[in-house]
């Protein structure tokens, strides 16, 4: 009488830490913060690690000139348990846990895994194979205001965003059922990077003359967006420890 869910699930743990500082003078204000989040999931081999930082600064250089600087950074590392059943990753593991018969044992008396046509999800979890996802993002902006004359202000600002992502899914060759041939081990990797640049120049005039007012705005905007993407796949690696793309059989490569 096998309880598949009890055999697989664990208690997830989350811890979070933050440090913030702020201060300044009459002409300068600043704020900075850093944070860390660590989390383990309810399935073995599932976890998340996040680091983030942010800083803001406002400066009155002169009575007419002000500068604003903002920067932020965040990095996430995810691990998700992988399955050997045609993709699906942890979703496939959860599906198997919910449909397997309680008449099938997790382990046989001889220590081998209980056999099913679709695979044994506990064997997948015990192998330690994971889907690894990495993402980092940086955002920075700078703005300068200058009061040219009474009512006339110029603002120049620019910003930059860069986002980097890496996906890696290695499927091990697991011989858990002697009566059924194992699929070859395989590796899929995806690399994505995008960046965006913005530039703005504004000239604002706002003046009241008695009962009349005049508002005029002139502006210029420029933007650039770059994207780079690469996907690779190979099979038949010499062993389950050498999970680098160059080690797979070149004849099986797809891009």
Placement of each model-derived feature along the sequence:
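Outer-membrane beta-barrel channels and translocator barrels
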Residues: 14, 25-26, 62-66, 147-149, ...
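Residues embedded in well-ordered regular secondary structure
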Residues: 1-44, 82-85, 121-132, 144-147
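An active-site-proximal structural segment forming one wall of the substrate-binding cleft
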Residues: 152
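Surface-exposed loop/interface segments of Gram-negative outer-membrane beta-barrel transport/assembly proteins
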Residues: 1, 41-48, 52-139, 155-255
């Amino acid at each position: 009488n096998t309880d598949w869910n009890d055999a697989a699930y664990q208690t997830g743990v989350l811890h979070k830490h933050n440090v913030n500082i702020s201060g300044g003078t009459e002409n300068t204000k600043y704020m900075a913060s850093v944070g860390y989040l660590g989390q383990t999931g309810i399935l073995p081999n599932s976890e998340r690690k996040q680091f983030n930082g942010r800083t803001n600064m406002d400066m009155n250089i002169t009575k007419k000139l002000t500068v604003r600087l903002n920067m932020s950074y965040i990095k996430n590392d995810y691990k998700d348990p992988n399955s050997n059943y045609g993709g699906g990753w942890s979703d496939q593991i959860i599906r198997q846990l919910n449909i397997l018969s309680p008449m099938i044992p997790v382990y046989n008396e001889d220590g081998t895994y209980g056999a099913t046509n679709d695979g044994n999800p506990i064997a997948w979890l015990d192998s330690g194979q994971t889907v690894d996802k990495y993402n980092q993002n940086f955002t920075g902006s700078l703005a300068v205001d200058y009061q040219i004359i009474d009512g006339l202000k110029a603002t120049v600002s620019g910003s930059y965003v860069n986002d980097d992502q890496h996906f890696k899914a290695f499927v091990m060759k697991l011989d858990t059922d002697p009566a059924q041939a194992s699929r070859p081990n395989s590796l899929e990797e995806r690399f994505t990077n995008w960046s965006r640049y913005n530039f703005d120049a504004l000239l604002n005039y706002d003046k009241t003359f008695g009962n009349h007012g005049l508002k005029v705005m002139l502006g210029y905007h420029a933007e650039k967006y770059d994207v780079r993407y690469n996907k690779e796949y190979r099979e038949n690696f010499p062993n389950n420890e050498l999970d680098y793309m160059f080690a797979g059989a070149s004849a099986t490569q797809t891009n």
